[in-house]
Design a protein with these regions (language model features):
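N-terminal "domain-start" segment that seeds a small globular fold
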Residues: 1-22
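Short acidic-hydrophobic, aromatic-tinged amphipathic segments that line or gate anion-handling sites
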Residues: 12-13, 83-87
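Short active-site neighborhood of thiol/selenol oxidoreductases, capturing the structured segment around
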Residues: 20-42, 48
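Hydrophobic beta-strand anchors of alpha/beta hydrolase catalytic cores
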Residues: 30-31, 58, 104
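Structural microenvironment flanking redox-active thiols in thiol-disulfide oxidoreductases
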Residues: 42-77, 88-94
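Short, conserved active-site loop motifs that form the nucleotide-linked donor/cofactor pocket
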Residues: 56, 82-83
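Thiol/disulfide oxidoreductase modules built on the thioredoxin-like
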Residues: 75-80, 87-136
């Protein structure tokens, strides 16, 4: 069982140099920790692309990467993210308790209500995140 917790307060730029802060996480969103050097991120990318076509807001957290490599990676493979927060030193990732990439956080109104380490796939989506999303929708 996952104990919900507050999303850490932050102010960072995204990969396109726009300012992003905690307030960007309203409603239901997924925060996916990824990097251009991460092999498993490549594996989960098609599923994230499919997910991004749903009404779920998918936000990237580019982790310990170079902006240039990250932009090239998305340029080649497609960008499923509404925006991707640039976290070159891993500061926000550290505050979130990230141990590596990929990791995905389910966030509802700035509360982290779910978390998985490793690849997000259809099975984990259905068994872990969907019940939490349904519960969040029922309480709002």
């Amino acid at each position: 069982y996952f104990q919900p917790k507050e999303l850490p307060q932050f102010e960072l730029l995204d990969l396109e140099n726009r300012e992003i802060e905690t307030a960007a996480f309203n409603g239901i969103s997924l925060l996916n920790v990824w990097a251009s050097w991460c092999i498993t991120c490549l594996v989960e990318h098609p599923f994230l692309t499919q997910l991004s076509k749903n009404e779920i807001k998918l936000i990237g957290l580019n982790y310990k990467d170079s902006q240039k490599n990250a932009m090239e990676w998305l340029g080649k493979r497609g960008n499923p993210y509404a925006f991707s927060i640039y976290d070159p030193r891993g500061d926000l990732a550290f505050d979130l308790g990230v141990t590596g990439a990929p990791e995905t956080f389910l966030i509802f109104n700035q509360q982290i209500i779910g978390h998985i380490q490793g690849e997000l796939n259809q099975e984990k989506w259905q068994s872990i995140f969907m019940p939490l999303i349904q519960a969040a929708k029922e309480t709002s």
